[in-house]
Structure formats: C-alpha cells, structure tokens
Amino acid sequence: MNALLEQKEQQERLREAAALGDIREVQKLVESGVDVNSQNEVNGWTCLHWACKRNHGQVVSYLLKSGADKEILTTKGEMPVQLTSRREIRKIMGVEEEDDDDDDDDNLPQLKKESELPFVPNYLANPAFPFIYTPTAEDSAQMQNGGPSTPPASPPADGSPPLLPPGEPPLLGTFPRDHTSLALVQNGDVSAPSAILRTPESTKPGPVCQPPVSQSRSLFSSVPSKPPMSLEPQNGTYAGPAPAFQPFFFTGAFPFNMQELVLKVRIQNPSLRENDFIEIELDRQELTYQELLRVCCCELGVNPDQVEKIRKLPNTLLRKDKDVARLQDFQELELVLMISENNFLFRNAASTLTERPCYNRRASKLTY
C-alpha cells in the first residue's frame, strides 16, 4: 500500500515538474523509473500534456525521446498537441502546419472551453515562478551536446539601461529608478559596482562634490565614519560614492562622551529648601553598585557607612549591579542617609515650623 502511494506521488511530481519546465527534475524522475504515460485520476492529464500546455519545448522533446505517448487523450478528449500554442512544439510533435506565412500566430493561444473541474490545482492557479528559467532552442541544443547553457541577456521591459554582462568592468553611471537601491548603496549595505547600471558610451563620469563632514558627526551617530571612497579607477573599476550622512536623532540631552554614563545625584534632605543635584560620571565598562556608591560618596563628601540606600527617583531602590547597568543618562538618584545625632547635615539643617514638636495647629488658626 505504501509503495502504491509513493508511486502515485512520484508520478504527480513528474507532472508538476513538466508543468514548471524543470528539465533537471524531469530527467531525474524519468531515470528513476517513473512512468511518463501516467495520467491524473481527475482530468487524465499526463506530463506531456502539461509540457505542451506550458510550451516547454525542451521538456516535450525529452519526454518524446523517453517514450511518452502523444496520442493519449484526457477525460475531455484532448491530445497533447491540441494544448500547445507554439508551432515549434507542433513540429516536434510531428504535426505540419499548412499556413506558415504569418509568424504572429506563434504566441496566440488557442481558444478552449473553460475547465469543468470543481477545483483549480495550485500549480495551475499560480503558474508563474520567478526562479524558473525556461531554456530556449539554442540552450536545448547546447544541453543535448553537453555544453554549458547560459541565459541570454535581454533588455529590461521598462526602458532602463541593461545590466552589466559578465566579464566586463562596471562603469560609473546612473542609479536605477528604485530609491531603495540607491539607499542601500549609500548606506554601504550593497557594494556599489553591483548596484550601478551601465550608461551609454557617450556618457563620461564627471566630478562629484563631496559634502564636508563636520566634527559634530560623532555627537549624532555612534556608527564609526567610513573614509570617503575615491572615484578614480581601482584595478579597472570605479568605486561608488561616499556613504550619505545620516544623523542619529536622540530624544533628550545627548552625552558628550559615549564612554561615560552621566547621572544626577543628591542627598535626601527634606529640611532643605534648595536641594540641588550634581552630575557625576561613571565608566560604562564598570557599571557596578560599589562603583556607583564610591563615586557618589566621593562627589558629595559622604562616608559610605552613612548611606542607608540609593533611590532612583521617584520611588525605585537600587540593590545590585544589574539595576545599575539599566541606568540611563541624566537619571536622578538620591542618597538616603542614616539619621543620627552625629549627622552634620541634619544637625545643622533648620527644620520647618510645622515639624517642631511644640507647634499647635489649632492655635495657629485662631483669630484674635
């Protein structure tokens, strides 16, 4: 049972490869012993029917040499030769045309009745595959003779200049109309010779003005700047233009030195009316809790033993090195000190009137 299912699967793969024009897959399946005259159970089509339907002349020639029957009928009574729209395939099938004057009939499909099938196969509903290349008659002859086959260079349909043929040095020219390719070349993601199109011979590369790059670029972009590329020929090729300047926009104040983390620190003391922050710098390579505590105490003139905790405003407690590593530039921190009688900050600070123990709120509201 499994062998029968595998055999049907191989036959279906052969019909699909013939419909796609994949001559290598067709040869591989035929050489492995797949029946070239096997028919689909629904519509009765063989691999030769599909090759004629899609006008793959090379596949048709190979199937006929492999013993494909060109007289097999489908469930609608169609022979393979009736499904093709090209005269060269009809000649391969052995059908001679009486009227050979008009060459425009080669690409005219024959009118056929609409399919009566309840469904449309996937390879029929989506016939175009961009990676499938249909060889021409010359390529067919080269493949049969054992020579290499290369796709011929054809000009683009939109009127743009043709791409560089292999073996010729790329010339400096205009970029394609697609701005995405231009952006990729300017950003350095794609090499310039592969994205530049060839220009007519009368066009010569002229001087290109390079915009001056100021020293402030290091403040806007963390990406190291690339040296400008020269337009002089190097080993017979022209290098592309210099990458475009793309500033890095930062929401908020931007630190001057990227190696340092700038923080705002103060001592928590609600008794003082003016309790300003000071800025400290930490090395980004040493973002640890002990280093933060050491720098804060050194800058504020506080003994580390007096620090009870470090608070990230408004209400987050810093406890370990990972908390310090998550800090951003210009975040506000507060050192909470232990309250004691020997604390010079709290001893000298003048408490407000409402915090004194002898303050009477009811008496303050009386009117005399």
Swiss-Prot record:
Keywords: Acetylation, ANK repeat, Repeat. Residues 93-115, 139-176, 196-238 are annotated as: Disordered. Residues 149-169 have a biased composition (Pro residues). Pfam families: Ank_4. ANK repeats lie at residues 9-38, 43-72. SMART domains: ANK. The modification N-acetylmethionine is found at M1. The keyword Nucleotidyltransferase does not apply. Residues 95-107 have a biased composition (Acidic residues). The keyword Cell wall biogenesis/degradation does not apply. Residues 212-224 have a biased composition (Polar residues). PANTHER family: ANKYRIN REPEAT DOMAIN 40 (PTHR24192), ANKYRIN REPEAT DOMAIN-CONTAINING PROTEIN 40 (PTHR24192:SF1). This is Ankyrin repeat domain-containing protein 40. The lineage of its organism: Eukaryota, Metazoa, Chordata, Craniata, Vertebrata. The gene is ANKRD40.
